[in-house]
Amino acid sequence: MQQFYCVKEVLNERLKRGYEFAVKNEYIEEKVTEKLQGIAATARMDGFRKGKVSPEFVRRMYGESIAGEVVAQVIDDISSKFLKEGDFGGIVTSGVEIKAYPKVCSNSEGDGGLVYELKFEVMPEVPVVDIDGITLKEIEVNISQEDVDEFLEDLKANYPSFVDVDDESRGVSDGDRVTISYRSAFKGKALRGGSAQGFTFVLGKGQLLEQFERQIVGMKKGESKEFKLEFPLDYMAKHFAGKEVDMHVTVERLSVKDEINDRETLASKCGFGSVEDMVKFATDGLNRRFADMGSVVAQRELLEHLDASYSVDVPEYIVAQELGRMRRELEEGDLNDAEALTKEAEQRVKLGMLLMKVATDAGVAVEVNDILSFIRVNYSAYGRSMEDVLKLFKNREDFREHVKGKVLEDKVVRYIISRAKKDRQSMSAGELKSLFESV
């Protein structure tokens, strides 16, 4: 049977395409009969010799299920051939809806042929990005003495020095370093892991439950105190979660921040050989910080340029996937403006497609070291072991594709920035910070 189906276009809207296929019933019947004959030739059934089962009996037994298999196979064969031979470019996603089943599968009236619709989205034509036509800010910051002083103040705050308090009338307050011993009990029984000797922490840093820290405020060196403490339901130690326990706490040692008013002492406390070494450390640190901030500003400027300069029809299916990811990432309060969220998802997809076009044209590819570096910075630095993240990368395809996509996008952005024209601008640290915060 040469022409066993006909096809007509039913949808052509932006990237969406739709085609209706009508397959002759005779073709379906022929395929079903072939399969049933194959079963009859090999079937073993009570009352029949092998290969002697009547075709009518086989059709009654297996006809409906075989017809379903044939329909599925016919749809797959026709659709695959149609998409392969059609000039559609890349296919984003496709779906089939059966409009009418063949008569062999049902008691439908008419000629009984199979009718189904194949709908799909095609990949858009993405324009070539003109890297030579891009100009980005290259920011140079003039580091002032005030910037260095501010850096050293941060250094002093981040690496505080403490001195013991001998005044027994001095109560504990925020910022003090406290050494305590404590024990806990639930219904009169000691809790596993609920006691410690010589435990040291800085009050107000969130190292302990807020309710616990509030009870410590005002206590004096050598003082003991008993109080009830309720652990939250989501507390990481499950045998504490949701319990109200009896606590007994003793303050063993109290230290306060030692005010350092000269650079020589600060340099010595922080392990520098000299004040000059410390100032060089500060200057180098500021240069790195400002370079990172300038890089973020350039990236934002690049993405804004691409968004404003190029138009791309984005596939709805990919936008819906991106929107789903965004909803999972955002807090509930950020989900109210559905229109703005959809617009951002469309923008992300558009920029991603432009960057992938650059990657393809320029031969930018993801290397193993790129992935390891990305994981080290974005996951391992936040308490996840490299081994755990790599295991997740190996076993979860969605996570693997997410990481590879982010790595490639970052690499392409750096590639474009390195080749774009530069508008060198000199500014103060304050001006750069304002620009950075507006990104």
Swiss-Prot record:
Per UniProt, residues of the PPIase FKBP-type domain are 175-260
**A GO CC term?**
cytoplasm
So what EC number does this one have? 5.2.1.8
Q: Output the Gene3D superfamilies linked to this UniProt entry.
A: 3.10.50.40, Trigger factor ribosome-binding domain, Trigger factor, C-terminal domain
Q: Which UniProt keywords apply?
A: Cell cycle, Cell division, Chaperone, Cytoplasm, Isomerase, Rotamase
- What reaction gets catalysed by this protein? [protein]-peptidylproline (omega=180) = [protein]-peptidylproline (omega=0)
Tell me where it resides.
Answer: Cytoplasm
What are the GO MF terms of this UniProt record? peptidyl-prolyl cis-trans isomerase activity
Top-level taxon of the source organism:
Bacteria
Q: Does the keyword Chaperone apply?
A: yes
List the Pfam families: FKBP_C (PF00254), Trigger_C (PF05698), Trigger_N (PF05697)
Cited InterPro entries: PPIase_dom_sf, PPIase_FKBP_dom, Trig_fac, Trigger_fac_C, Trigger_fac_C_sf, Trigger_fac_ribosome-bd_bac, Trigger_fac_ribosome-bd_sf, Trigger_fact/SurA_dom_sf
Q: A Gene Ontology biological process annotation?
A: protein folding
Which family would the database say this protein is a member of?
Belongs to the FKBP-type PPIase family. Tig subfamily.
Q: What does this protein do?
A: Involved in protein export. Acts as a chaperone by maintaining the newly synthesized protein in an open conformation. Functions as a peptidyl-prolyl cis-trans isomerase.
Q: What is known of its domains?
A: Consists of 3 domains; the N-terminus binds the ribosome, the middle domain has PPIase activity, while the C-terminus has intrinsic chaperone activity on its own.
Name of the molecule in the record: Trigger factor
Q: Which gene encodes it?
A: tig
